[in-house]
Amino acid sequence: MLTIKRFTCNMLQENCYVISDDTKECVICDCGAYSQHERQSIIDYIKELQLKPVHLIATHGHIDHNFGNNTIYEQYGLRPEVHKEDEHLMEMLDKQAEGLVNVTLDYQMPNPVYFDENHVIRFGTHEFTIIETPGHSPGSVFFY
């Protein structure tokens, strides 16, 4: 059985999800946690449930879905996984932050891992396939 915990994050009210199963492995999806409180809430939830994060995935490469990637990388060693068509967006997260929400990032983002529609996200006894849904961004995806 899957457990899905939602965290509403940042000034744009983006939703971050921690998705886990009975094995305690989990996936963090769209970690838009901006404030220290938001970041700590996600870490505390993972600790409280004794989860083991194995993937940090993003539905697309906009900054509001990626603000917290550095914290997840520092805590768990996970690099963000995003569709290869959003590589250009991931390379300019700092510019997105300045232009979209007038924020200067004072930290370095981890280098992403890029995937395509043939990639499968495996965790515990579950897996997500990638469904390409370009439009919002060239690399927008659903995980199914």
Indicate where each model-derived feature is located.
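Divalent metal-coordination and catalytic microenvironments
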Residues: 19, 30, 60, 72, ...
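Structural motif
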Residues: 25-27, 52-55, 126
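Conserved beta-strand hairpin/beta-sheet module of binuclear metal-dependent hydrolase folds
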Residues: 1-49, 142-144
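Short Gly/Pro-enriched turn/cap motifs at secondary-structure boundaries
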Residues: 7-8, 104, 110-112, 131-134
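Short Pro/Gly-enriched beta-strand edge/turn motifs at strand-loop
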Residues: 1-3, 100-103, 124-128
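Active-site HxH/HxHxD metal-binding segment of metal-dependent hydrolases
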Residues: 34-39, 43-122
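Core dinuclear metal-dependent hydrolase active-site scaffold
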Residues: 120-144
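Short, glycine/acidic-enriched loop or turn micro-motifs at the edges of active sites
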Residues: 24, 33, 63, 86, ...
